């Protein structure tokens, strides 16, 4: 099974990784997957989850908040703190 199912997660886009992760969750929730396969796809799901988290962290680091002066004119950017 060295096809798309074993595609290298480290090169996946966020959208592709989340799509495959959602597919795995659905298969596991359906409960029709044999035990060994369930364990294997669960492990793949964990890898996909980590990839998605990594890509989200990278995206967060790129988001900037525009700063303005007293007159409201843009003067620069600073990291956006959304907490």
Curated annotation (Swiss-Prot):
The gene is xseB. The keyword Cytoplasm applies. Bidirectionally degrades single-stranded DNA into large acid-insoluble oligonucleotides, which are then degraded further into small acid-soluble oligonucleotides. Its EC number is 3.1.11.6. PANTHER family: EXODEOXYRIBONUCLEASE 7 SMALL SUBUNIT. It is found in: Cytoplasm. It comes from Afipia carboxidovorans (strain ATCC 49405 / DSM 1227 / KCTC 32145 / OM5) (Oligotropha carboxidovorans). Pfam families: Exonuc_VII_S. Keywords: Cytoplasm, Exonuclease, Hydrolase, Nuclease. This is Exodeoxyribonuclease 7 small subunit. Heterooligomer composed of large and small subunits. It catalyses: Exonucleolytic cleavage in either 5'- to 3'- or 3'- to 5'-direction to yield nucleoside 5'-phosphates.
């Amino acid at each position: 099974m060295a096809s798309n199912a074993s595609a290298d997660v480290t090169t996946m886009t966020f959208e592709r990784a989340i799509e495959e992760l959602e597919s795995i969750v659905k298969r596991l929730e359906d409960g029709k997957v044999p035990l060994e396969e369930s364990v294997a796809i669960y492990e793949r799901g964990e890898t996909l989850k980590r990839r998605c988290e990594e890509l989200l962290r990278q995206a967060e680091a790129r988001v900037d908040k525009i700063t303005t002066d007293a007159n409201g004119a843009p003067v620069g950017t600073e990291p956006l703190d959304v907490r």
